[in-house]
């Protein structure tokens, strides 16, 4: 078997060169174990996954999700910076961009579920800071099942009348989704 690893400079960290594993080659292959011409089939794929991600270990990227009417982008930038200074590779979404490890990957309003999935699919990210706005939640949901930390900053009338949300109570119901899907700490 072999592991194929791509990098521009093998003497440097993969984080500096954007290197990474592109393929794991099992030898002599899995098919002979999964569908043998003789004998009992074996779930070797499951055994490989159990070795890579042992049962009971954390395989999910920790998520901090922020929502509110005002201050989401500022707070998400601040949290992303704190986490980066603590040594993490941060994936962040905001009304400005998707940012991975301090590098802008996509510009524009990236507060919806598609951008959240972009961050969570990036193999270099080890913590996510996701700004989640009313529009994305109403149109398409969150882009993640749960978060570890959720923050609902405020609910004010600034964005009423958009996307079928016409009252403060209605806006609060949309924003409280973040508190409801938080498995750890909720900041109100």
Regions found by a protein language model. Name each.
Residues 55-101:
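Walker A (P-loop) phosphate-binding motif
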Residues 104-188:
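Flexible active-site lid/hinge loop adjacent to a nucleotide/diphosphate
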Residues 50, 81-85, 121:
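Short, well-ordered alpha-helices that flank and scaffold nucleotide-derived cofactor binding pockets
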Residues 22, 64, 91, 149-151, ...:
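Hydrophobic/aromatic beta-strand patches that form the interior of the parallel beta-sheet core
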Residues 17-18, 58-62, 85-89, 123-126, ...:
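Short coil/turn connectors at secondary-structure junctions
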Residues 9, 28, 72, 135-136, ...:
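Glycine-rich nucleotide phosphate-binding loop and flanking beta-alpha elements
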Residues 1-67:
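ATP-dependent carboxylate activation and anion-phosphoryl transfer catalytic cores
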Residues 27-31, 97-100, 156-160:
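A short, flexible beta-alpha/helix-coil linker loop
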């Amino acid at each position: 078997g072999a592991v194929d690893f791509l990098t521009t400079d093998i003497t440097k960290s993969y984080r500096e060169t954007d290197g990474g594993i592109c393929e794991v080659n099992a030898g002599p292959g899995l098919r002979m174990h999964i569908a043998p011409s003789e004998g009992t089939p074996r779930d070797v794929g499951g055994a490989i996954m159990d070795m890579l991600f042992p049962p009971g270990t954390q395989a999910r990227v920790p998520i901090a999700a922020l929502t509110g009417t005002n201050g989401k982008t500022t707070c998400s930038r601040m949290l992303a910076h704190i986490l980066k200074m603590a040594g993490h590779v941060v994936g962040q979404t905001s009304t400005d961009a998707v940012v991975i490890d301090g590098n802008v990957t996509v510009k524009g309003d990236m507060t919806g579920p598609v951008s959240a999935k972009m961050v969570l699919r990036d193999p270099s990210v080890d913590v996510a800071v996701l700004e989640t706005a009313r529009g994305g939640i109403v149109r398409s949901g969150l882009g993640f099942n749960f978060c570890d930390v959720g923050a609902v900053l405020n609910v004010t009338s600034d964005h009423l009348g958009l996307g079928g949300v016409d009252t403060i109570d209605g806006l609060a119901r949309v924003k409280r989704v973040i508190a409801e899907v938080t498995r750890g700490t909720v900041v109100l």
